């Protein structure tokens, strides 16, 4: 089996390079790839890549994910998150390939306190959410052999993340204020990548599982409680923090160009049922990532 991965150097793409390697012959591309186009600002180019390589499975981890920046560059966000997805979907349909694509809880309005189901009405609050929803629809309309995974609060050990930012600030400051009225489940790129590899194998044998799924870690937290766990684990690991006071504040305390949903909870029952997997509680992945951070020596 031949697998084509777009967005290989992002948080999820990096982990997909690992998880997909045993599943098939993997060709991984990003915006800088030379031999084949992996640049999502070039829809014709990425579609041509699909037609040239004729993979069995395409995994798209490329996207415009700068939520606030998208507000000031909606055309670019639309190009990366929807137009190029449509181009790939059409090329995949011509060649008979499966397409795996990642979307977001930002397609919902973020109201209430009940986990969103795949069948719930969408109503994005910002440009990022609108363009990701357009990408979903483009794939659904043009390539029936698809898996769309909506996820949320994604983190990875590689690169910057919320935990690293909180730890840096906690070493510098005695007081921190963190938002406590946004709810979701921190979801590791590692978990997404492993679930994707499994789902691909299932889909190839059971094509009827094609469709839209919610995929996040188990449980729910707030950014404030997420930060509190990070600090607790750091202190257990013997890391000295200047922090003595952690305050809980509303979203309104930190105005941003793009509106954020208050309710990012996603119901994952459909995914767990169709792919026969159990999604672990969010704390498990975060603690594992923190342990690796605390024990890694910078050379």
Swiss-Prot record:
GO cellular component terms given for this protein:
cytosol
Q: What is this protein called?
A: dTDP-4-dehydrorhamnose reductase
Say which family it is in.
Belongs to the dTDP-4-dehydrorhamnose reductase family.
**What Enzyme Commission number(s) does the record list for this chain?**
1.1.1.133
Q: Which cysteines are joined by disulfide bonds?
A: none
What does the cofactor field's note say? Binds 1 Mg(2+) ion per monomer. Mg(2+) is important for dimerization.
Q: Which residues are NADH-binding?
A: 10-12, 30, 39-40, 63-65, 128, 132
């Amino acid at each position: 089996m031949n697998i084509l991965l777009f967005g290989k150097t992002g948080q999820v793409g990096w982990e997909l390079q690992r998880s997909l390697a045993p599943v098939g012959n993997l060709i991984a591309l990003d915006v800088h790839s030379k031999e084949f186009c992996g640049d999502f600002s070039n829809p014709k180019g990425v579609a041509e890549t699909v037609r040239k390589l004729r993979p069995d499975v395409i995994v798209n981890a490329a996207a415009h994910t700068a939520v606030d920046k998208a507000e000031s560059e909606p055309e670019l966000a639309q190009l990366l998150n929807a137009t190029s997805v449509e181009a790939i979907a059409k090329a995949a349909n011509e060649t008979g390939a499966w397409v795996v694509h990642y979307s977001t809880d930002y397609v919902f309005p973020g109201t209430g306190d009940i986990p969103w189901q795949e069948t719930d009405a969408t109503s994005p609050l910002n440009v990022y959410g609108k363009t990701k929803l357009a990408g979903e629809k483009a794939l659904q309309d043009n390539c029936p052999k698809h898996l769309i995974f909506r996820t949320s609060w994604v983190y990875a050990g590689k690169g910057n993340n919320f935990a690293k930012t909180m730890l840096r600030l906690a070493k510098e400051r005695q007081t921190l204020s963190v938002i406590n009225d946004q709810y979701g489940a921190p979801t590791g790129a590692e978990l997404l990548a492993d679930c994707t590899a499994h789902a691909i194998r299932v889909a190839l044998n059971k094509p009827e599982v094609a469709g839209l799924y919610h995929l996040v870690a188990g449980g729910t937290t707030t950014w404030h409680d997420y930060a509190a766990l990070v600090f607790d684990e750091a202190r257990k690991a013997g890391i000295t923090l200047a922090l003595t006071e952690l305050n809980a504040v509303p979203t309104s305390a930190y105005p941003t160009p793009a509106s954020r949903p208050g309710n990012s909870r996603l119901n994952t029952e459909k995914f767990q049922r169709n792919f026969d997997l159990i999604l672990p509680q969010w704390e498990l992945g975060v603690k594992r990532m923190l342990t690796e951070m605390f024990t890694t020596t910078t050379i």
